[in-house]
């Protein structure tokens, strides 16, 4: 194989390894929603999946409404959203 072909192959492999974790994220679509504290004022500690950081992070949940990217524990968030 020529050096140009090897460079192309190396470039494609590099691109594939960079994009694979994002495209293989098998969690539900709601795991990509931003954290939504809701309108209430109970100030509960909750966790949401941050797709940019690829991890579950803590936020303050007001106790009502919000969205489905809202978990009581980091473990539950990880179990649902990280595949």
UniProtKB/Swiss-Prot annotation:
PROSITE patterns: BPTI_KUNITZ_1, BPTI_KUNITZ_2
Any one GO molecular-function label of the UniProt entry: serine-type endopeptidase inhibitor activity
Keywords: Disulfide bond, Protease inhibitor, Secreted, Serine protease inhibitor, Signal
Keyword Signal: yes
Disulfide bonds: 31-81, 40-64, 56-77
Tissues of expression: Expressed by the venom gland.
Pfam family, one: Kunitz_BPTI
Matching SMART domains: KU
Signal peptide: 1-24
Keyword Cell division: no
GO cellular component, one term: extracellular space
Residues of the BPTI/Kunitz inhibitor domain: 31-81
Function comment: Serine protease inhibitor that inhibits trypsin, chymotrypsin and elastase, but does not inhibit thrombin.
Family designation: Belongs to the venom Kunitz-type family.
Protein name, per record: Kunitz-type serine protease inhibitor bungaruskunin
